[in-house]
Structures are given as structure tokens and as C-alpha cells.
Amino acid sequence: MEKKKKPELSRRDFGKLIIGGGAAATIAPFGVPGANAAEKEKNAAEIRQQFAMTAGSPIIVNDKLERYAEVRTAFTHPTSFFKPNYKGEVKPWFLSAYDEKVRQIENGENGPKMKAKNVGEARAGRALEAAGWTLDINYGNIYPNRFFMLWSGETMTNTQLWAPVGLDRRPPDTTDPVELTNYVKFAARMAGADLVGVARLNRNWVYSEAVTIPADVPYEQSLHKEIEKPIVFKDVPLPIETDDELIIPNTCENVIVAGIAMNREMMQTAPNSMACATTAFCYSRMCMFDMWLCQFIRYMGYYAIPSCNGVGQSVAFAVEAGLGQASRMGACITPEFGPNVRLTKVFTNMPLVPDKPIDFGVTEFCETCKKCARECPSKAITEGPRTFEGRSIHNQSGKLQWQNDYNKCLGYWPESGGYCGVCVAVCPFTKGNIWIHDGVEWLIDNTRFLDPLMLGMDDALGYGAKRNITEVWDGKINTYGLDADHFRDTVSFRKDRVKKS
């Protein structure tokens, strides 16, 4: 697929970049005092325009592609759902992980064989993690059209939300895609999105079947009561659920994808409790985001389907919405945060202007880097090339991607007492958009033999090394754990929110 021409960089310019004048600019963003904040802000604003691709999906598929059933994920499939705990007792994987968390607290550990300052610190990390999950668990991230992840706003009464009576039933007053895109992206930022993009709904990435529970089963009684329910598209006016199906209207044409950033320092302690905590808080933020944005869209006269982790494949939607590119580890790597984001999406019939996918060299870089595969504790990440053939039931064949062993990945979670995250922590792009400055993107995309040099510099400077939890607790923390320069790097004005194709 054709993409926008990259800036030219001569051999002489490259020499200056590495050994001369440009070197200071290159190294400065790694933490040297005096880094040019104005230039950094300018570059961040230009990233997506600079790396925009032509219209269409950058995801390569063949005729073997079929919609993927959610039950095939390692989290839910019978072949991977049960894992032994540290005593050898076989349980659902998350219960075995809970046992390990308790063992670590009692032994004064922040993670697997990682001593805490004291038992109090060990407990504090797990307490923060457990608190972080509160909204996610209670608002029903796991199951579609359950609890507060409803496909309609019927149970969210006007009394509860202080909305003018009938606002959600009033026909749309605005149908202009440009105006509506501006409104919805503003609302998305207000609802907590650190990144937001729009894509045309590609049904290939919607699950063929969802994993859910019967509507009359309380969440606390849902264990072992999950059922599979097909997701189908039909000529219906609104999203509905029957006894047999979850039905998305054929008029559902757009998906809004949001990235919710995690705290970098906390994630870089992985696989420790603090990495689990920033993950947990992001999942709860995802739930709140979906609830708020869906209600805004409904009050504008359109329908909206929340999803968080469910309904479809978040990474594929994020790639097509221009948030980033798919990576070797399987996550979406964004220019601003690397893979250190969680993704959620909202499906709607609201007319919107789609964003263009971007290409800033992630595929070429991942082909050579392999740092996530090298550091993966379970060796679940492949060091081989991308293929169309899945390696197990958990992979989707027919899509060109790195095919990883997600059963191995999940198997390490009970051992570590958490959700690992080592691949995200060690990824060079997790440091943020410094890898997009001063010609580095040109080197990655055009000079593949230099990729090992970039990785070597990354290792030599100590990036990707595990952070100490005590230092993180004693360090500075901003609201929601966001980095100090967070909003400068993600600011979006109207002219940036709406780009006509």
C-alpha cells in the first residue's frame, strides 16, 4: 500500500545525526536536561499527518480468513483455561494467579522471587491492583450487553443521568460527518481517551461468537456459567439481543477506537504488582470511557455499542483507525506511547470521517529487534517471520501476523501472580515518541541494517531494564499516573481531530 514519502536523509546528514550536531538532538529526548519541548510538541502533532497511508486497511489477509470466535482466546478456551497454582492444584487460571498473589504478600514479595522492602509494600502493590479493577469488574467489561456495558441506554434512566427527558429518543439534529467527528472526538477526550481514531467497521474483526453469561445470572455467580452467543448483522433499527443472538444493525458503519495510556514507570516494573496495578486502573478507565461516550452518542440521536475488550479484535480496529501498527508481541504500537496503552472501541451508526492508517516503520523494526521475544519469560513470542498460518486454536489464520503461543503466555500469569507485561515494558517504543524524532524513523524504515544499532543503543542506555518498585512508590505521581508531558504529547485541536480523506 502506498504511503506518504518520508523525508530524505543524506549520508552526511546521517553522520551528523550519529556523531555530530544532530546527536545531541537525538539523545536529548532520552532524558538529558534541556530537551527542546517546543520541537517535541511540534513533532508529536505532525506524526499522524507525516505517516498517513492511503485509504484502505494495511492488514494483509488471504482467502483463509474467517471471523474469529471469542471462545478461542486463551482466556476462555477449555485447552488453556485451567492452570496449576504454586501448589500444583489445577484451577481457572485467574484463581491460580490469586493464590500466587497471596503467597507473594505473605512472603514479602512484589513479584515472582522479587523481594519487597517489607510485607507492607508487598501488600500495598496488590491492594492498589485490586482497587484498580473495581469499576471494570462491577461495570461488566467481560461480557457484552451485561451490567453497564449495555447495547442500549434503557436502564440508565434520565433521573440517574440528569438528562432532558426524551433526549435519547429525539432524532439527530446533526448529520454532517465533519461536525459529528469533531464533537465525538472532543467527547472522547473528555471521557478519558489519550488517543482516539475512527475507522469504517470491518466485520472481519467482529467476533463470530461472543462469550457471555445468561442475562439473569449475577456476576458473582458467573463462574462456569459462560455461554457462546453468535454476533450477527441484520436489518434491525437498534442493537438488540435475543435468546439466540447478539444482533448488530446493518447500519452500523463506524468504530471509534480509543487508547488509554498506562503509567510508564509502573509498567517498567513488570512482572511485578505495580505493572498489574496500572493495567487494572486502565481497564476501569476503559469502562468509564465506553459508558460516557456511548451515552453522548445516544443523546445525539444515534446508537452506540460499548465493547472494552469484547465484541471484536481491538488491535485490528486500532490499526485501521490510525492509532498505530501491529507488532511482534501482538499489541498495537503507537507513536506516542508505544504498546503501553489499553484499547477500547465503540460501534455506532453516527456518520463520521474515518482516519487514515499510519506506517512509521514498526513492522520493519520488529522484524529485526526481537527484544520482546528475547525477554519473554514464557518464550511465547515467536522469533520467526509473520505468517498466515496460526500455530494453535488461539490464533487467527488468514491474517499476516506474528503467530504467538498465547497458551504459554497465559501459563506464566499464575506463576507471576499477575498479567506479566514484560514485552510492553522492554519494548523500545514504550519510551514514547522519542523514536520518531530527528530522522530515526527514516533509519528504521529505510536502513534495516541499522535496526540492531538502535536496539544496541537502547540496551546500552539501560532502557528496558526493570524498575525498582520502591523507587516508583517514592517517586512523583501525576493524576491518573500520567507522565508529566502527557497532555502536551497528545493534545488535539479541531483541525487535528477532523481530517478529510
UniProtKB/Swiss-Prot annotation:
Extra remark: The pceA gene is detected in cells of strain N, but this strain cannot dechlorinate PCE. The inability of strain N to dechlorinate PCE is probably due to the absence in this strain of the specific PCE dehalogenase corrinoid cofactor.
The enzyme's E.C. designation: 1.21.99.5
Protein name: Tetrachloroethene reductive dehalogenase
Signal sequence interval, chain numbering: 1-37
Molecular-function GO terms, alphabetical: 4 iron, 4 sulfur cluster binding; metal ion binding; oxidoreductase activity
Binding residues annotated for [4Fe-4S] cluster 1, in chain numbering: 366, 369, 372, 427
Root EC class: oxidoreductase
Subunit description: Monomer.
InterPro entries: 4Fe4S_Fe-S-bd, 4Fe4S_Fe_S_CS, RDH, TAT_signal
Gene: pceA
